[in-house]
A protein has these predicted regions:
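Glycine-rich loop(s) and the adjacent beta-strand/alpha-helix scaffold that form part
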Residues: 28, 39-49, 206, 222, ...
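Short, hydrophobic/aromatic-rich segments at coil-to-beta transitions
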Residues: 244-250
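Conserved redox-cofactor binding core of oxidoreductases
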Residues: 113-230
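N-terminal glycine-rich phosphate/pyrophosphate-binding loop and immediately adjacent elements
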Residues: 1-118, 277, 292-305
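Short, well-ordered loop/turn elements at secondary-structure boundaries
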Residues: 6-7, 28-30, 78-79, 84-86, ...
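Short alpha-helical segments and helix-capping/turn motifs at coil-helix boundaries
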Residues: 17-21, 75-78, 142-148, 213-214, ...
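A glycine-rich dinucleotide-binding beta-alpha-beta segment and adjacent secondary-structure elements
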Residues: 7, 66, 197-200, 234-237
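Short, glycine/acidic-rich beta->alpha junctions
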Residues: 15-18, 142, 208-212, 262, ...
Length: 305
């Protein structure tokens, strides 16, 4: 086979938690990396101020809605997931919980390996450091009401504040103030502390939420990773039978009213478009395009999101 002139060493599909971590760690190893994201790239000021601003809140591009929140409906569930550079980190509730033992001990996990808890333990610490995990001590009348209800039904001990990925002020009266990077010894972006506005799931306009643009993607771009928004992958084809020779990726780019389709070649591909992006894409490649026929028939089973 002739030597292939690859466009990239690795193409990462999706810019959420999985894609951003993959891109950063690959770039640290010296690989040339491209992130493809079907949604838009936003500055903090571009997030909507209300979910009634449907064009900037919801993702329904066929209706002209190019927001951050996509709804996927199945026969049993309604799933909300993030779209845009930063993925779900833009609009999730910031809560950082380590699963209880019952999760690690469930059959879906233990039939693969028995030591998940110990295996993952050091990586939870690393993720917490990168995402700026801190305990949210703020409570209001809604929290007080929940605490009272829990007490009335005999579950008072279950009430607690949670760890979140938000930059909180270190002293009362300093909410919203600008501070030099508080997480990476001054090597990361400057931040403003939380003003407790409650707009976390609309998108933080105040530079306080520790979205992936403030950490993993920030350092990825500094390492030379390229991020292409408005770029949706429509086909993945291995260049030989098992993909060892690399892959061709067909991309549909939508910028404004302009649409173009082009192909890229890379040594490897990382699919990290979230459960509702990655699983349907793999099913499509296996069953419709038949470019990835060796994907397991178990794809889509035992899924957690």
């Amino acid at each position: 086979m002739n030597k292939i002139d690859f466009d990239y060493d690795q193409i990462v599909i999706g810019s959420g938690f999985g894609g951003s971590v993959s891109a950063l760690r690959l770039s640290e190893k010296g690989y040339k990396v491209l992130i493809l994201e079907k949604g838009l790239r936003r500055e903090d000021k571009d997030f909507p101020t209300t979910n009634l601003d449907t064009k900037n809140y919801l993702w329904r591009p066929e209706l002209g809605f190019r927001g951050t929140m996509q709804f996927t409906f199945t026969s049993k569930t309604t799933i909300l997931h993030g779209v845009g550079v930063g993925g779900g980190s833009q609009i999730y509730a910031n809560v950082h919980l380590i699963p209880p033992d019952a999760v690690f001990e469930s059959e879906a996990w233990t039939k693969i390996r028995k030591d998940w808890k110990e295996t993952l333990k050091p990586f939870y610490g690393l993720a917490q450091r990168m995402l700026g995990t801190a305990n949210n001590t703020y409570t209001n009348i809604a929290d007080d009401t929940l605490k009272e209800v829990a007490s009335e039904i005999g579950y008072a001990d279950s009430f607690k504040t949670v760890n979140t990925g938000v930059f909180f002020s270190q002293a009362a009266g300093q909410e919203g103030q600008l501070a030099k990077d508080p997480y990476f010894n001054g090597d990361g972006p400057d931040r403003n502390s939380c003003i407790y506005c409650g707009a976390c799931m609309l998108g933080c306009r105040n530079n306080a939420k520790n979205t992936l643009m403030k950490n993993y993607l920030y350092f990825s771009e500094r390492n030379g990773v390229e991020i292409r928004p408005s770029s949706e992958v429509v086909k993945i084809t291995p260049l030989n039978e098992d993909g060892r020779a690399g892959y061709e990726v067909i991309v549909k780019e939508t910028l404004g009213k302009q649409v173009r389709q082009y192909s890229l070649q890379s040594r490897g591909v990382v699919l990290s478009a979230g459960v509702m992006g990655t699983v349907p894409m793999l099913l499509k490649m296996r069953d419709q395009h038949k470019t990835l026929p060796n994907i397991s028939s178990l794809l889509g089973q035992e899924v957690r999101t």
